[in-house]
C-alpha cells in the first residue's frame, strides 16, 4: 500500500513539474498573431465553404491582410461582410466578385429530392453551417434560411438527390434597381 502512495505522489509531482514547464514555455515562446487577421476572421461568416478560392475563412483573412487579396470574394457573407472589412481596413468598398456574380446570379440553396434520399447523413457531415437536418436512414431536408449555397453537400451524396436551385424571389429578396424607377420630387408647402 505504501508503494502505491509513493507512485501516486511521484506521478503527481512529475505532472506538476511538466505542467509548469509547458506553461512557462507557452508564454515565453508565444507567437503573436496579426491582430488585423484576427479581426477580419471574426467578420467572416466561418462557413469554410471555399467559394473565395481559399480552403477556409482563416486563410482568406490572412490573404486579405498579408497578400492584399480582394475583399469582395466571400459569397456567403455578401456585401455586408465586404463593407465591414472595407471599413476595418480603411479601403474603398468594392463590388462583389464579378466571377461569383456570373456563376451564381441568384442566391442558391440546396434542395434534397426526399423520395430518393437514403438517409446516409453524408450531406449532414459535409454541410459547414448545419443547414441539413435528418437522422440515419430517415429523410433529410435543408433549412433554406441557413443554407449558403456552397455546394459542399452535393458531391458526397451517393444517390445524387441533392441539387442547387435558385431561391424564389419575394418582395423581400428582390433586388430593386432604383436607377430605373422614375422618381419625381414633389415640393411640400408648410403651413404655419
From Swiss-Prot:
The record's InterPro entries line, in alphabetical order, gives:
4Fe-4S_dom, 4Fe4S_Fe-S-bd, 4Fe4S_Fe_S_CS, 4Fe4S_Ferredoxin_RnfB, Elect_transpt_cplx_RnfB/RsxB, RnfB/RsxB_Proteobac
Binding sites annotated in the UniProt record for [4Fe-4S] cluster 3: 127, 147, 150, 153
| Location in the cell | Cell inner membrane
What Enzyme Commission number(s) appear in the record?
7.-.-.-
Coarse class of the primary localization is: membrane
Query: Record's Pfam families?
Result: Fer4_21 (PF14697), FeS (PF04060)
Task: Tell me the ranges covered by the 4Fe-4S domain, including all copies.
Answer: 32-91
Q: Which GO terms describe its molecular function?
A: 4 iron, 4 sulfur cluster binding; electron transfer activity; metal ion binding
Q: Which cofactor does it need?
A: [4Fe-4S] cluster
- Which keywords does this chain's UniProt record carry? 4Fe-4S, Cell inner membrane, Cell membrane, Electron transport, Iron, Iron-sulfur, Membrane, Metal-binding, Repeat, Translocase, Transport
Q: Which residues form the 4Fe-4S ferredoxin-type domain?
A: 108-137, 138-167
Q: Which domain of life is it from?
A: Bacteria
* Sites where the protein binds [4Fe-4S] cluster 2: 117, 120, 123, 157
**Family annotation (SUPFAM superfamilies):** 4Fe-4S ferredoxins
Question: What PROSITE patterns does the record point to?
Answer: 4FE4S (PS51656), 4FE4S_FER_1 (PS00198), 4FE4S_FER_2 (PS51379)
Q: How is the cofactor bound?
A: Binds 3 [4Fe-4S] clusters.
Region Hydrophobic: start-end pairs? 1-26
**UniProt keyword Transcription, yes or no:** no
GO BP, sorted A to Z: electron transport chain
UniProt subunit comment:
The complex is composed of six subunits: RsxA, RsxB, RsxC, RsxD, RsxE and RsxG.
Protein task: Part of a membrane-bound complex that couples electron transfer with translocation of ions across the membrane. Required to maintain the reduced state of SoxR.
Q: Which family does it belong to?
A: Belongs to the 4Fe4S bacterial-type ferredoxin family. RnfB subfamily.
* Identification of the protein by name: Ion-translocating oxidoreductase complex subunit B
Q: Which organism is it from?
A: Shigella dysenteriae serotype 1 (strain Sd197)
Higher taxonomy: Bacteria, Pseudomonadati, Pseudomonadota, Gammaproteobacteria, Enterobacterales
Amino acid at each position: 500500500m505504501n508503494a502505491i502512495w509513493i507512485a501516486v505522489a511521484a506521478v503527481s509531482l512529475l505532472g506538476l513539474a511538466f505542467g509548469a514547464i509547458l506553461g512557462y514555455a507557452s508564454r515565453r515562446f508565444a507567437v503573436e498573431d496579426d491582430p488585423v487577421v484576427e479581426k477580419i476572421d471574426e467578420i467572416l461568416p466561418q462557413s469554410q465553404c471555399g467559394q473565395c478560392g481559399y480552403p477556409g475563412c482563416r486563410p482568406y483573412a490572412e490573404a486579405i491582410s498579408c497578400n492584399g487579396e480582394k475583399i469582395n470574394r466571400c459569397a456567403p457573407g455578401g456585401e455586408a461582410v465586404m463593407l465591414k472589412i472595407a471599413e476595418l481596413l480603411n479601403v474603398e468598398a468594392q463590388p462583389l466578385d464579378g466571377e461569383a456574380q456570373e456563376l451564381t446570379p441568384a442566391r442558391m440553396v440546396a434542395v434534397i429530392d426526399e423520395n430518393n434520399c437514403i438517409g446516409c447523413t453524408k450531406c449532414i457531415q459535409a454541410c459547414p453551417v448545419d443547414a441539413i437536418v435528418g437522422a440515419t436512414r430517415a429523410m433529410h431536408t435543408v433549412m433554406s434560411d441557413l443554407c449558403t449555397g456552397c455546394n459542399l453537400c452535393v458531391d458526397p451524396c451517393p444517390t445524387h438527390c441533392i441539387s442547387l436551385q435558385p431561391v424564389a424571389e419575394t418582395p423581400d429578396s428582390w433586388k430593386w434597381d432604383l436607377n430605373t424607377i422614375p422618381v419625381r420630387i414633389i415640393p411640400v408647402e408648410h403651413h404655419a
